[in-house]
Structures are given as C-alpha cells and as structure tokens.
Amino acid sequence: VISRNFTVVPLRKQDKEDSRMRTLLIGLLTCLVLLGLDRPARADLDSYFRKPEPVYKWEKTGEKKVDGGTVIDLHLVSQTWQGGVWQHRLMIFRPDKAVRTDFCTLFNTGGGGSDGEITLGMTAAQITGMPFAILYNIPNQPLYGGKTEDSLIAYTWEKFMETGDESWPLHFPMAKAVLKAMDAIQAYTKEAGQTEIKGFVIAGASKRGWTTWLAGASKDPRIKGIVPMVIDTLNVTAQIPHQLAAYGKPSEKVQDYTSAGMQEKLMTPQGKRLLALEDPYSYRDRLTMPKLLVLGTNDRYWSQDALNLYWDDLKGPKWVLYNSNAGHGLEGLDTQLRVLNAVGAFARAVAGGNPLPKPTWKYGFRDNFSYLDVHSDIPIKSAKLWFAHSDTQDLRDAKWASAPMSPIDPANPTHGVFGSKGVPAQGYTAIYAELTYAQNGKAFSLTTQIELMAPKK
C-alpha cells in the first residue's frame, strides 16, 4: 500500500440464385475461418514451444576439474528457426560442496563463452550451493546481413508485421532454446549417473531477461523460479508514452527500434498482436512462480520508475533488487557480488531452503519530505535509503547516494525501518530502500520499488 500525498510522475435483394450463391460463399468463408486458412501461419508461444524439433541433440565435448568443482561442456542443437539450425555451447558447473544436486540455476546469455567465465560460473555454483549452467549463443547471430542484438530483434518484428508469420519474433526461438537446454541437462545427468535435476531457476539479462520471462510463461513444470535482469519494459504500450514523458524522446539505447518506427508500429493492430505474443505482461497470469527482478539504476534503456507500470500486476511471490549507479550492465564488482548473493539466496529458497523475507513498504510525503517505511517478517541486518535528484524526470545521469535508515520501533529495531529525504522546491527526487539480510551466515540484499516524486503544487 502506498500513501500518495504527493505528486507522482504519471507513469496510456437479390434473386433466389444470387441468394443461394451468397449463402454458399458465407458458408465457405466460415469454414475457412474455422480452419484458420483466412490468416497467415500462426505460431503462438504455446504451439511454438510444442513444435517438434527433429534436429535437437546434444553431445558432451569436454570435462575438467577446476578449483571448487567440475565443469562439463556440452554442444547443443536446439531447433530449426526460419530455415537455420541453432547451435549452442552449454556449460554445467558442479560444485564440490553442494547443498542440492537435484536443482540447477540456468543462465542464458549471448556470445560463445570463454575460459574467463569458468571462474564466474563456478563462483555462482558455490554461492547457490547447487549446479549452475550457462547457455550461450542466445540468440544465434549475426543473421540477415550481419544483424545482431536489438537490430536483429527489430528486423524480426518487422518481418512479422510484413508476413503475419507468428514464428518470426526472435524471443520465441531464444526462449525455446532455454527449454531445450533443460532437456539436455537432464539427459546428460541421467546418462552420467548423476542425481536427476528436477527443478530449474531460469535467469538472464537484458533481451535474455525477456527470454527468461517467456520461458517462465511456457508453463513448463520444471521451472520453479525466474530471475529476469535489466529488462524493465513489461507493459510496453504503457512504457512507450511514459518514457517519452520522462525523456522527451525515445532513449538513445533503443535506436534500432526507433529507426524502424516501432514506437508507432506497435500501436497498430499488427503491432498490438506482436505485443500480445511478445510482451511478458501478456502472460502475467501464467507467471505465478517466484520471481526476483534484478535492475540497475541509471539504466538508459528504460525510465527510472518503469517497474511501477507492472509490479502490482505480477502474480505470485516477487522480489526486486535495484543496484545503485550500476546501469544496464550492472557494472562494478560490488554490484556483481550483490547480484550473485541475491540470486543464491533466491535459488536456495526456491529449492526448498530458508524462505526469503517478505518486506512491505509505504511511501508518503509531508512538509517537503518524502518518507519510506519498510516492514519485514524476517530481521533486517542493515538498511539504506538510496536517493537521487534531477531537474527533470530524466535520471539517467543522476548520482545516487545513500544514508542509513532508522528503526521504526526502537524496542523492535530489526523488523521495521524508516527513512526520509527532503525534496527540493524544483525538480524530481527518487528514493528506494535497500535491505540487507543474513541467513546461515550468507548475506544478501533486497530492495523496494523506486518512487519518483515532485513537490506538491
């Protein structure tokens, strides 16, 4: 519940023979509609995921012992998409000291992997206390004349709008590859005589975070939790005008979409159909599994408070972790460790370990001060109030600072904290709280939403 005593930035006749002929024509058209022959080939998310993939296969290409565990290398062929066979590197990191061996965190990413990422993968496995896997080459690229990343996604959206072929949107094969990676991991562990992997936490960043949402929407019972990172654009039809109100024009980071006229095209009937297929917000009633949203402040792709356009509509257990001054890349070793620790706590909780805290928060505004009260069912080890200010709604270049929060009740200091920040007479102030917890000697952080406010006029 949020007390809104302040101005919040708005997050928009003929003869018998002719009659018989007309009746026959109507009947024929009705049959065509029922048969689906009146429209282009359809491939909604469910049918795309169900489509058989005869090329699917995997093989083990390597195994080596490293400090802290074992790394297994697999080569995965996931599917055929638009005539091309998708291939991936799939690395599995098994820690020597595992809390659970029947659960796996699966991180999907781009690139082809490097030896330098072995340390990161094994560190993640040790922190989570269970196998950790990295699926590479999401998506397979470059394609169509060298297109990669956002230019490739924008191209596939245009192809959908031109053809009506619902298998074109790139996130579909990206998400299906994740499902096929789960198949491969389970098949490998069975063949190797290892403990069967029964549950997965799926994670990924940016467009791979979008992939994470859609994989979760598959209703695959193996997916027990999801961690979408730095993909703060659910409810796209509301996000577009919200960003324009904040920035005055689309972010420079979405130039590939702007150049293709996507902001306008997405408001057309074909564009709305695309979003019904692609926008994870369309699948929110399915996304009831536990979810941890990892975001960076100053992420230039999205409006700073974009989460507030969909957070309340997310079903099931949910948590958020903002990372101050971290941007879209979640830069900095401290940030990366904070993210790994939070993902570890989340994965352990989803796998049946200690449940995560359930913080609740309430914002208020009084006497030119913004207030934030936070309550927690589990003791809080420490709490910070993060704040930033800008003359406009554009906080992309704002510098975030923090101050300690104080107990609401000194007699019960670890279950409730508050913080306040003066709001200047001009401009906009954003605040959120970071809460640090400790479970079984492992520290991790969670945060509240960001609230962006201006003095009440």
Locations of regions flagged by a protein language model:
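N-terminal cap/lid segment of alpha/beta-hydrolase-fold proteins
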Residues: 51-98, 166, 171-172
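Short beta-strand element of the alpha/beta-hydrolase
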Residues: 89-92, 101-110
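Cap/lid segment of the alpha/beta-hydrolase catalytic domain
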Residues: 130-179, 233-253
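Gly/Ser-rich "nucleophile elbow"/oxyanion-hole loop immediately N-terminal to the catalytic nucleophile
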Residues: 161-206, 218, 223
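Mobile cap/lid helix-loop segments that gate and shape the active-site cleft of serine hydrolases
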Residues: 190, 237-283, 288-290, 294-303, ...
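Hydrolase active-site cap/lid region
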Residues: 214-264, 321-325, 330-337
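Serine-hydrolase catalytic core
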Residues: 270-326, 367, 373-381, 392
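Surface beta-strand/loop "capping" patches
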Residues: 345-387, 404-413
